[in-house]
């Protein structure tokens, strides 16, 4: 069933605009759906379920970690981002900081890409560019 969920991030080169074109090209009787260039996961989130086995992958391990944490530890992730302020000082702390746990790394990555110009995590923008 198509539910058209939205990704929690925007990603350069994402397939957000192509998902309605891609969906009819995928056979309905597949046993596994593998997303090798996952990016913002727009195609994966477009349907409630593509197959019994769904695999998200991307060359950028920070993306993989972010979506793994959101899937398996959503409450911890929400709790961590609930009180984040969009200040330049905090952006610089996140940009230059060292984060130990996978949850901390996911929050760091999410904060940087949602509060940076073009979602690249390099230049601070005062307002978030996407919302969870």
Predicted features, each with a name:
Residues 49-132:
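Class I S-adenosyl-L-methionine-dependent methyltransferase module
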């Amino acid at each position: 069933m198509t539910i058209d969920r939205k990704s929690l991030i925007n990603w350069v080169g994402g397939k957000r605009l192509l998902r309605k074109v891609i969906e009819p090209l995928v056979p309905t009787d597949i046993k596994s759906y593998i997303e090798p260039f996952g990016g913002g996961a727009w195609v994966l989130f477009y349907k409630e379920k593509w197959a019994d086995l769904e695999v998200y992958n991307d060359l950028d391990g920070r993306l993989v970690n972010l979506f793994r944490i959101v899937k398996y530890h959503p409450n911890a992730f929400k709790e961590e981002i609930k009180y984040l302020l969009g200040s330049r000082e905090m952006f610089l702390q996140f940009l230059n900081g060292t984060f130990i746990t996978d949850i901390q790394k996911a929050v760091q990555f999410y904060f940087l890409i949602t509060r940076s110009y073009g979602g690249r995590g390099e230049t601070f923008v005062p307002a978030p560019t996407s919302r969870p």
